[in-house]
Swiss-Prot record:
Belongs to the glycosyl hydrolase 17 family. Its EC number is 3.2.1.39. GO terms for molecular function: glucan endo-1,3-beta-D-glucosidase activity. GO terms for biological process: carbohydrate metabolic process; defense response. This is Glucan endo-1,3-beta-glucosidase GI. The keyword Hydrolase applies. Young leaves and roots.
Amino acid sequence: TIGVCYGVVANNLPPANEVVQLYRSNGLTGMRIYFADAKALSALRGSGIGLILDVGGNDVLASLAANASNAANWVRDNVRPYYPAVNIKYIAAGNEVWGGDTQNIVPAMRNLGAALKAPGLGTIKVSTSIRFDAVTNTFPPSNGVFAQAYMTDVARLLASTGAPLLTNVYPYFAYKDNPRDIQLNYATFRPGTTTVRDPNTGLTSQCLFDAMVDAVVAALERSGAPGVRVVVSESGWPSASGFAATADNARAYNQGLIDHVGGGTPKRPGALETYIFAMFNENFKTGELTEKHFGLFNPDKSPAYPIRFQ
């Protein structure tokens, strides 16, 4: 599955019904939204598009963790009115949560899981979406281990429910932080790169993306959750306004990603469910200027650069 993350940190994006049409006309079968956006959820009815539904900010996460009735109310308001007409696959209890807020992840996941046990909702899986740096010792990939203890609890909960771990994987940031040791071609799926062999497993990574995903897999194994699937909940490359942020590199990376993930990684061959960040260039994004330029499309729905999804 290739999905695309539909962020709305902008003031110039098309209405949600046109966005869903743009997904469908491009053959995109997955979407991620970052809060329970009623306009997007309504527009998705009957589309068949598989959805990652984020709960929203850390305040929402804290409320869901605080007690079961808050989670039941959230499901009543944001899931029941839409499911199954909207194909909600996963609920993400937090996105790149860090610091003290991490203590809310497992309780929120448990409370949401209990609320979804109600009749007719049982196929929706609850997870959380992590930054890649939740894993440490990532080279070679087989040495990967979760950096903090709470992730072991997350992994074991996922193992018990059959839900995947949602992971944001950005070779761009790894390359930007260490261009001396990482080749651009290796980071962008371009051919002719050095391959990297893992001395512990004998497996060879042809691209940085595979090495990163397989480090997450190793961390899951080390935490006693070898059966948990990884879903790449964000990955992408900026096309402007920063180091190595060009349309050429963004196209190479995202086209390479689309063409690559059907085969999985050396450690886990087979299709890898992946969501590209992001659908649109978002002009109100804060932080580094590149944050405004991760989009596959401009707000007028024209492609930011040529790309094919099939």
